[in-house]
């Protein structure tokens, strides 16, 4: 968290003034998230990890110039995760841009025990099957019983771990060696845990958890 953060947006001012106290409140405020410091302020235990580094050389009149393109993921391991990209002429600024953009892209996911083989009721896996796509890559994530672990690719594993998902099955199609699209397709799948609506009249056998585990409860949004 930057020590001398001066909010520049309405959402930032509401957070700094204590009128919005949680990241969940911020994301549901319908105000745009344009300051990464808001996320730092509301999720002090946020972690970040670089998952892809691309280097490209180009020739200029003054010689060869290197450009960096970075993909990073942030999360608190408890229902919140973001993926972002950053570009710069040097690695360090590109990494910072990627992490800051990941914070601006942060989402609140749903978790639960969606595996019929388990039924423990804990938020260890996905609440239901979700699909995501980016470019040529498509990703499918399925709920798994407790103890299975993350039976997914390495890139997906980092993102799910950051989101707070401990068990999942997954498979991908397309050019998964393109790490950026692989990561974005996974992120797109996690967004579906939020966008897919569940009929409130359905009596679920296990609860669905929204965001942090303190928000456990019903299937209603």
Swiss-Prot record:
Domain S5 DRBM: start-end pairs: 46-109
Alphabetized InterPro entries for the sequence: Ribosomal_Su5_D2-typ_SF, Ribosomal_uS5, Ribosomal_uS5_arc, Ribosomal_uS5_C, Ribosomal_uS5_euk/arc, Ribosomal_uS5_N, Ribosomal_uS5_N_CS, Ribsml_uS5_D2-typ_fold_subgr
Gene Ontology terms: cellular component: cytosolic small ribosomal subunit
Superkingdom of source: Archaea
Entry keywords, A to Z: Ribonucleoprotein, Ribosomal protein, RNA-binding, rRNA-binding
GO annotation (BP), single: translation
GO molecular function: rRNA binding; structural constituent of ribosome
Gene3D superfamilies: 3.30.160.20, 3.30.230.10
Record Pfam families: Ribosomal_S5 (PF00333), Ribosomal_S5_C (PF03719)
Matches recorded under HAMAP family: Ribosomal_uS5_A
Family recorded in the similarity comment: Belongs to the universal ribosomal protein uS5 family.
Note on domains (UniProt): The N-terminal domain interacts with the head of the 30S subunit; the C-terminal domain interacts with the body and contacts protein S4. The interaction surface between S4 and S5 is involved in control of translational fidelity.
Oligomeric and partner information: Part of the 30S ribosomal subunit. Contacts protein S4.
Function: With S4 and S12 plays an important role in translational accuracy.
Protein name: Small ribosomal subunit protein uS5
Organism in which the protein naturally occurs: Picrophilus torridus (strain ATCC 700027 / DSM 9790 / JCM 10055 / NBRC 100828 / KAW 2/3)
